[in-house]
Curated annotation (Swiss-Prot):
Modification Phosphotyrosine occurs at: 24
Organism: Pteronura brasiliensis (Giant otter)
Residue span(s) of domain Globin: 1-141
Keywords, ordered alphabetically: Acetylation, Heme, Iron, Metal-binding, Oxygen transport, Phosphoprotein, Transport
Family matches, as CDD domains: Hb-alpha-like (cd08927)
Protein name: Hemoglobin subunit alpha
Residues bearing the modification Phosphoserine: 3, 35, 49, 102, 124, 138
Gene Ontology CC annotation, any one: haptoglobin-hemoglobin complex
Entry's family note: Belongs to the globin family.
Length: 141
C-alpha cells in the first residue's frame, strides 16, 4: 500500500520528469531488452536495435500509462483495467516482465536524476511500480 509520503514522492518525481517521460520510457524499454533478452519475444515485429523508432514509440506508451497511473494512484485498478485486460488476455505477457521493466525504469530515472533519487524516493517509486505491476497482472488469475 502506498503511503501518503510515497504518493507525494511519486508525484513530485513525475512532475520533475515532465516532458521527458516518453524518452525515459523508451530508454527503459531498450535497457530491458538489452539486459533481459527474453523480453524481446513479445516484439517479433519490432526493430529492436538501439534508438529504434518503434521501441521509442512503445516506451512512450509505457510512460503515458504510468503518467495516467500517477494521476489515479487512489484507484489504480480502475485506471489500468483496460491495460490489464490487454496484457492478460490478448498479449499474454509473462507477469515477470513487468518486474524487469520496473527495475529498468528505476535505473533509468536514477541515471537522469541522481540528486533527486534519494533512498526514500527510490523506495516510493519501487513500491509504485510494484503496485502498478500487481494491478496489471491481477487478471491473470
Amino acid at each position: 500500500v502506498l503511503s501518503p509520503a510515497d504518493k507525494t514522492n511519486v508525484k513530485a518525481t513525475w512532475d520533475k520528469i515532465g516532458g521527458h517521460a516518453g524518452e525515459y520510457g523508451g530508454e527503459a524499454l531498450e535497457r530491458t531488452f538489452a539486459s533481459f533478452p527474453t523480453t524481446k519475444t513479445y516484439f517479433p515485429h519490432f526493430d529492436l536495435s538501439p534508438g529504434s523508432a518503434q521501441v521509442k514509440a512503445h516506451g512512450k506508451k509505457v510512460a503515458d500509462a504510468l503518467t495516467n497511473a500517477v494521476a489515479h494512484m487512489d484507484d489504480l485498478p480502475a485506471a489500468l483495467s483496460a491495460l490489464s485486460d490487454l496484457h492478460a488476455y490478448k498479449l499474454r505477457v509473462d507477469p515477470v516482465n513487468f518486474k524487469l521493466l520496473s527495475h529498468c525504469l528505476l535505473v533509468t530515472l536514477a541515471c537522469h536524476h541522481p540528486a533527486e533519487f534519494t533512498p526514500a524516493v527510490h523506495a516510493s517509486l519501487d513500491k509504485f511500480f510494484s503496485t502498478v505491476s500487481t494491478v496489471l497482472t491481477s487478471k491473470y488469475r
